[in-house]
Amino acid sequence: MLVYDISRRATFRNCKTWLTEARACGNPQMVVILVGNKSDLSESTRAVSEAEGRAFADEHGLLFLEASAKQRKHVDEAFVRPAEAIHGLLANGTIEAGDLSGVKIGPGSRARADAGGKACC
């Protein structure tokens, strides 16, 4: 998930760098959503238009939406849409769960205690 502040153009400009870094370290099939945050602000405060955000997302193959955490608008959707896209990739065989790396959750996923008796999870 890449999030920028629609009232601060610098945060939008940084999205290209952040995306490049994420793709360099992640799976090529990675699902990314671009979220323009603070959509509750007035149009006069806006520094990045919705069309600009959508064009960037289209150009880079990203999902897109604008949200307002303050108004709780589209916040859930920012998480649900990528999850649905990942589910679709798994369902149609584009990716297989065994091919993915990342955080493992479930039995046996906790780190073992080191010699000092400390463990991390």
Q: Model regions: which residues?
A:
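Generic structural signal for well-ordered alpha-helices
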Residues: L19-T20
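Conserved P-loop small GTPase signature centered on TRAFAC-class small GTPases
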Residues: P28-C121
